[in-house]
Regions:
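Short intrinsically disordered terminal tails
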Residues: 1-2, 74
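Short glycine-/aliphatic-rich beta-strand segments at the starts of folded cytosolic domains
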Residues: 2-12, 46
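Short amphipathic alpha-helix segments
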Residues: 11-34
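Short amphipathic alpha-helices in soluble, non-transmembrane regions
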Residues: 19-25, 56-64
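Acidic, low-complexity, intrinsically disordered interaction modules
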Residues: 26-58
Length: 74
């Protein structure tokens, strides 16, 4: 499966910071994601290059914290 480039856009910068901490903790528990996922952030956007972008969307939607975000597949 080819990797997809996605961009997560958050409405507030502190939301990106809160999300990043939780998401990267989750990634560290799922080592296969870390190997298959490259990421960086610019302003309120988190750019991810991954095989598993649908899993990222599911993770965000199933999290107890609700984030004001959208995903764009690049």
């Amino acid at each position: 499966m080819a990797k997809s480039n996605i961009k997560l856009i958050f409405k507030e910068e502190n939301t990106l910071n809160k999300f990043s901490i939780l998401f990267f903790n989750y990634l560290s528990q799922h080592k296969c994601w870390l190997k298959n996922c490259n990421y960086h952030s610019i302003k309120n956007n988190l750019y991810i290059h991954t095989h598993n972008y649908s899993y990222i969307d599911n993770y965000i939607n199933n999290n107890s914290i609700k984030y004001n975000y959208k995903i764009i597949k690049l």
